[in-house]
Amino acid sequence: MLCAIYKSTRKMGTYLYVAKRDQFDVVPEVLRNAFGPPVFVMMFNLAGEKALVNAEKAEVRKQIETQGFYLQMPKEDDWLFKL
């Protein structure tokens, strides 16, 4: 399963995963407004062997299949956000 990954222009470290590139109709309007204009990062194969850095592939896939998207928030303990 391929998914498209976008980064937020308003919240550093926040990413949105959707099933198809530029398909945001499944994302609630409130979330789209808070996320800001999405910036395309890459297509990612959730069935492949490569791991995601800050998310579990199985959870991403499950969320995309059930609600149409997955929202990755920054880790609270990430030292870069404390600078």
Curated annotation (Swiss-Prot):
| Alphabetized SUPFAM superfamilies for the sequence | YcgL-like
Q: Which residues form the YcgL domain?
A: 1-83
InterPro entries for the chain: YcgL-like_sf (IPR038068), YcgL_dom (IPR027354)
From the Swiss-Prot or TrEMBL record, give the protein name: YcgL domain-containing protein PM0444
Q: Organism classification, top ranks?
A: Bacteria, Pseudomonadati, Pseudomonadota, Gammaproteobacteria, Pasteurellales
